[in-house]
Structures are given as C-alpha cells and as structure tokens.
Amino acid sequence: SAVTGDACFYYENLATGVCFGHAADKPVVAASVIKLAVLIEAFRQMDADAVRANEMFVIARTDKLPSCGALNYLHDGLCVTFRDLCVLMTILSDNTATNLLIKRLGIGNINDTLRMLGAEKMTLNRLLFDREASSRGIENYITAREAGLLLKRLYDGEAVSGPASEDMLSILKDQRLNGKIPFLLPHSVKIAHKTGEDDGITHDVGIVYARQPFIVCFCGEHVSPPEFERAMQDITLMLYENAERIR
C-alpha cells in the first residue's frame, strides 16, 4: 500500500497450489521480461529442429543496441551461436542478442507460442529500441499472472519438452542481475528469474527454490524504481522465510 504507481504482484506456492495477487491481470509495458517469451520460443524451435543451437551469427555494428548486455561493447564481426544469444539475452538482458533472436524466430511465432501456453495478454508487438513503433504507442506487454504462468510451465516441464524446460531454468538460475528478488535471500538459494527496467518501470519475475518452492512476480509501471524494488526485496524475504518454516 506504500508503493505509488501501478504495482502488480503474483504469488504461487508450487508445493500447495495456493496463489494470490494484486492487479495481477493488469497489462503493463514489458521491458525485458518479454525476453522470457523469446527464450521459450527459441527453445521450442530448437526442439523442433527449425533452428540449430550452434547456428552462427556474425555481430555487425548495425546490430548493436545500447544499454543492457555485452555485445554492444565487443568487436564488430564477433561470431556467436544461437544458444549463446539465448544465454546473453537472459543472464545479461542483452538487447542486441534479443533483437537478433526475435528477427530469426519471428514475432508471430513468439506470440503463437504464448497463446498455446495460455498467455492471452502477454504480447510481443515490436523489436526493442524500435523508436518509430514506440512513437506510435506500440509496446510489448506482460501481466504478473501470465509471467507466473510461463514460469509454472517451465517448472512443470511443459514450456517445451521436459529437457528443454530444464535447460531454460538452468539459464535463468545463472541470472547476473540480482538486485531485486534475490537481494535479501541467502546466496545458497537457487532462483530462476528475469528482470526488466525502463523509465518508471521495474519488474522481476521468478521461481524461488525454498523448502516449498514458489513463484513470485513483481511488475511495476509508473513507479519509483527504488521504492518498488525495496518492496520486492522485503516481500520476497517474507515469503521465503514463510516457505522455509513450512514442513
């Protein structure tokens, strides 16, 4: 109640099925959480042999995007595999890797897979840093509940195949941007999660592998990021401590 702006929240206990939320069905601008949908479609196409994990991409200067990631800072002409693009997109939120993947996979295919998984509001409408589309009000959208749905599909081994779902979770567990959901938790706790940020926007959605594992999704738009991120940290710690007490 102390957080200003559109603060959306979803929680699901993966041991008991108990779930609750606040504004969990409200669409908000996705920022980098949309990369979770790109990751799932990438692994679906690898599973279907539509793309190879070792397919090579040459990173041109014109491919490079600012802000998050590493590729923008590396030499032109660098060769990177398809799977490595998936890893960079996920653990460093690399924007260059993301747009290369979206172009290879197809926006329509990504959205079709979202619908197949049961996500009706989560939508990829444009590439990242598409200023022309953004100026016309075209954005990518998520909801806290549907981010949780994708995480549940991964946890249950149903996002693609069981092995592909497990592989994606292993990548998400290697996340390097850990200032939100994981911040107050013991370093030994495994957390598979994806963050997102933009002006007045901060998100983090993930699975916390406590004694009773749980999904927690925070999506904040028109918020003060420091204020909402502190709320994320405090709420996650409370949920974790409760999950550790339950036998």
Question: What does each model-identified segment do?
Answer:
Residues 1-24, 208:
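A short, well-structured edge-of-sheet supersecondary motif
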Residues 64-99, 140:
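Conserved catalytic neighborhood of penicillin-recognizing serine enzymes
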Residues 48-74:
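Short, glycine/proline-biased beta-turn/loop segments that scaffold the active-site neighborhood
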Residues 19, 104, 149-179, 188-190, ...:
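Structured C-terminal helix/loop/strand segments within mature extracytoplasmic catalytic/sensor domains
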Residues 3-6, 99-151, 155:
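Mid-domain, small-residue-enriched loop/turn segments at the edges of structured enzyme/sensor domains
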Residues 17, 29-57, 216:
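Active-site SXXK
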